[in-house]
Amino acid sequence: MKPDETPMFDPSLLKEVDWSQNTATFSPAISPTHPGEGLVLRPLCTADLNRGFFKVLGQLTETGVVSPEQFMKSFEHMKKSGDYYVTVVEDVTLGQIVATATLIIEHKFIHSCAKRGRVEDVVVSDECRGKQLGKLLLSTLTLLSKKLNCYKITLECLPQNVGFYKKFGYTVSEENYMCRRFLK
């Protein structure tokens, strides 16, 4: 299988979010359908492997060495599950991914078999910080989780980022986030 433009999920979902429910302020105004000059907000596709997707992710955390085969296998798994919404912003003039964030849907038995959204891996490339792309991705994925009928959406962040996420209606939970790592 060769990298192509097939999206991980239906791109119309991003256009159908109810932007009137957005709680963040954008100046200048941007939206999922108008993210800025030369920019497109869309689902990840396998061709993004060659558009700097891992370069951007690497600005957030260690990505490790990922072969094209590994990438394709993970992409197909996520696509088939229907519960992964890896979203990117592409600078179409450069043909490069400049920002990404992921919404993952968890299916629960609680709350009448409800769904919970979880935001992961929000990162904007160094060159594009200050263009509100992180805000745009977070607002879009938050509204998408509502459209997908999630009963709540959560995320984990560093203490210095709490203020940023509060702008979108997120609150600090009384629960503790705990982790046990198996890989360093």
UniProtKB/Swiss-Prot annotation:
Annotated membrane topology is:
Peripheral membrane protein
Q: What pathway annotation does it carry? A: Nucleotide-sugar biosynthesis; UDP-N-acetyl-alpha-D-glucosamine biosynthesis; N-acetyl-alpha-D-glucosamine 1-phosphate from alpha-D-glucosamine 6-phosphate (route I): step 1/2
Domain N-acetyltransferase spans what residues? 39-184
Q: Does the keyword NAD apply?
A: no
Reaction(s) catalysed (UniProt annotation): D-glucosamine 6-phosphate + acetyl-CoA = N-acetyl-D-glucosamine 6-phosphate + CoA + H(+)
Which residues does substrate bind?
Answer: T61, K108, F109, I110, H111, E120, D121, V122, Y151, K152, E175, R181
Please name the GO terms that the record assigns under molecular function.
glucosamine 6-phosphate N-acetyltransferase activity; identical protein binding
Q: Which Pfam families match?
A: Acetyltransf_1
Q: Which Gene Ontology cellular-component terms appear in the entry?
A: cytosol; endoplasmic reticulum-Golgi intermediate compartment; endosome membrane; Golgi membrane; late endosome
Q: What is the protein name for this chain?
A: Glucosamine 6-phosphate N-acetyltransferase
Query: What high-level taxonomic lineage is stated for the organism?
Result: Eukaryota, Metazoa, Chordata, Craniata, Vertebrata
The gene name reads GNPNAT1
